[in-house]
Every structure is written in C-alpha cells, then in structure tokens.
C-alpha cells in the first residue's frame, strides 16, 4: 500500500516510509567504501591514502546536490501541504535545472583545484599523482553525482521512496561489479576505481531524470517553469545546513589528515580512512532516516498539523536512540573484523585502526540526534537554525577538538576529538529544540 504524506504515522508506518531512504544512503556510501576496499587490497596503502586524501574536496563539490535536494524537498513538501501542486512542480523543475548547471561549473573549477589542495595537505610524489588521477576522473561525472544526491531526497517528497531505492541499488551494484572488474581483475588501481564510481554516478543521475521528464504516477514531474529567484533562494537557505555540514566535514577531514600526517604519517591517514568508510554506513542510517522523514514534517508544517508534528518528533527521537545504542555496540564488537577488511595486510596499521575505532565508536551514541535535529528544522523551513546546528557540529566543535585534544593526548586526542565534538553538538541541538518548541508547536 502506497503511503501518503497526509497519513497518520505510527512507528511502523514511519519506519516503512523512511526505510527506502535509509537503504539509499547506505548504498550511496558503498560507492566510496567499495572503492576503498578494492584500492586498499589490490593497489596498496599509498593508493588507498591517495583516495582518502582527495575525497573531502570531491564531497564538497558533490554536496551541492544534497543542498538542493533537502532544501528544495522541504519547500516542495510545504507547497504540496498548502495544496499548490502546479507550483510544487515548477519549483521541482527549477532546482533540477539549476543544480545540473552548477555541476558543470563546479566540475571545471574542481579540475584546477585538485593539485593545489592535495599539495596543501602534504601530498607529494606518487601519493600526489594518484590523488589527482582519481579526482579528475570523478569530476567528469560530477553533474550526475549532484543529481543523484538530489533525487535521493526528492524521491521521498514525490512519495516514491521505493523507486529511489531501486535506482540507488542499481547504481550501487554497478559500482561494485565495475570495481571488481577494473581494480580486482584488471589492475587499473585508482583509475579503475574512479571510472567505476563515475559510471555508477551517471546511472544514479540519469535514470531519475528520465523518469521525472516523462509522465509518471508520482506527485512530481518536470514541467515548463519561470525562473523564481525567491523559491531558489529559499531552497538554498533551507538546504544551507546540509551544504554547510558536508562542506564543514570535508574541511575538517582535510585538517584531520594534516594532523594525522604530523602525528602518524600515511598510516594515520589510512586508519582515518577506514574509520570514515565504516562511519559512512553507520551515519547513512541516521541521514537516511532524517531525509526520509523530512517530507512528512514539511507537509504537516504546511498543513499546520501541530499534533502530528509532536508525534513525529517524539517517535523519531526514540527510534534514533535505539539505533544509536545498537551502532555503538556493533562498533565495539566488530572493530577488529572491520579493520581487517580494509588493512588486514599490515599488522601495525591494523592495530592502529582497531584502537582508533574502539574510541571512535562512542560518537555513534550522540551523532544521530544532531543529524536529525538539523534535518527537522530544514523541514520546518527554518534554514538558519538548521545551519547553526550543522555549523557547530561539523565545523566549530570539530575544529576546536582536533586542534586542542592532540596537544593533550597526541594521536589518541585525534580519535577522541570526534567523540568530544558530538557530545557538544547534541547539547546545542537539545537547546535549539527546547527554544523553538513554542514557535512551531511541536
């Protein structure tokens, strides 16, 4: 049975509606993880470090799609809640068009930024050259990567989360098969890994574009539109928190890599890469749930259904709490097997990775609440509050921690800084939720 945004959502229905978005985010994370697995095990730790070194810049450029998807999705859902279907389709078409054009411009810009950014982070020799090779191939598919991120959010708004899941699974499976072929069978190293990812991103961006360009049974389709500056600015404002979050995380990742090069060398960067890969899967569950439930929040906000808003918030926080405990336990129990999956060929690097993960796992107890809190305010069209939560969580607290903690605990301080930043961010999120309660009636 197809679930409508106007339905009443109990725990079962809420999870059913959000599940496709959760799986979508997991499969999106698999792109990077599969690359990392094959590159590390078949091309060696220098190639693995090269991918990890340049990845933050690529994520900064790609997260424009997440900004348009979450920000536009919130505005579209609110517009549908106000019973303005034609206007919703015009906004939908506007943001798809603008984001695709942004992708082309950013791809050209990124092409020239790759080398100076890699050199700034301390890369040289083979590490530098492999970073640039990987980055330039990925940039060819950047417009499709942006569209893929965007459609992952908008499929839920169109009340077609399962269709979004099928597209993401198809592109994810394509990535895995191509990685096995181009890195495992044909030893093309970072070139093969980048080509596999670029092709899968093309699939993930083009298939939804074709679907929405034709007549379909969803609530959204591409139509003729007038350039609406106000709607575009509102979209960017709503999605600024998600954009800022991804940009900040990428900037912080660069700083982590610089600190790790200082305290542990290339092995430290490789260990951090393993943490980030595993974290992508765990965080994808929180992000997927937040993205999947955001259209429901936005619709009920537009319909002024405060009773449903209260129920959605309380149920969501309970679900996140249960997931957080399970993720922490899984992180502690499977630190060693997960480490062996990526760096089992190097005992010293494996030992460092397992130790780091046993500390890092504590962050899972707190991160989901801040991720959901930011998304919740985006869905309420309160982009400023959402951006503040993201800015504090992903930039201010992380920067402060990663600069100060190593002065006290050296290498362990770098791993502890992630946990410390999440504790500070959940405190800020709770304060914002309490402070805005009367204004939004939740």
Q: In which residue ranges do the predicted regions lie?
A:
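Residue-level hotspots within pore-lining transmembrane alpha-helices
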Residues: 23, 27, 31, 61-65, ...
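Helix-terminus/linker motif at the lipid-water interface of multi-pass membrane proteins
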Residues: 30-48, 118-125, 181-188, 250-277, ...
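Transmembrane helical elements of multi-pass membrane transporters/channels
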Residues: 16-35, 137, 171, 200-204, ...
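Membrane-helix interface/capping residues of multi-pass secondary transporters
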Residues: 36, 45-48, 85, 114, ...
